[in-house]
From Swiss-Prot:
InterPro entries: Ribosomal_Su5_D2-typ_SF (IPR020568), Ribsml_uS5_D2-typ_fold_subgr (IPR014721), RNase_P (IPR000100), RNase_P_CS (IPR020539). Keywords: Endonuclease, Hydrolase, Nuclease, RNA-binding, tRNA processing. It catalyses: Endonucleolytic cleavage of RNA, removing 5'-extranucleotides from tRNA precursor. The gene is rnpA. The keyword Glycoprotein does not apply. This is Ribonuclease P protein component. RNaseP catalyzes the removal of the 5'-leader sequence from pre-tRNA to produce the mature 5'-terminus. It can also cleave other RNA substrates such as 4.5S RNA. The protein component plays an auxiliary but essential role in vivo by binding to the 5'-leader sequence and broadening the substrate specificity of the ribozyme. GO terms for molecular function: 3'-tRNA processing endoribonuclease activity; ribonuclease P activity; tRNA binding. Its EC number is 3.1.26.5.
Amino acid sequence: MNYDFSRELRLLTPEDYKFVFKQAHRAGSPHFTILARENSLSHPRLGLAVPKKQIKTAVGRNKFKRIVRESFRNKQHSLPAKDFVVIAKKSAQELSNEDFNKLLDKLWHRLSRPSRG
């Protein structure tokens, strides 16, 4: 199995993001929200939204993105064929890396279950 985070595993265009925002299933926490929507591909894709307004420093924004990408990269083979967008909130920078990863795992699992609607 390949665990890289190649270009095909990313949401690249504004249209990709709009597609997810239009009719997304949400899984949230006080620290970040993950939106998910089925895609027509055979693999999941990830997009990140980390506003300067929420996480002020570039170091904080980069850390958030690095942790989310790493978690996605390791979970990609167990995730369904959906497009995911992770949106940061202010309190995300207060989490330790360990707590951050536990919370991400919980939300990935929640969004991996078949939807009821």
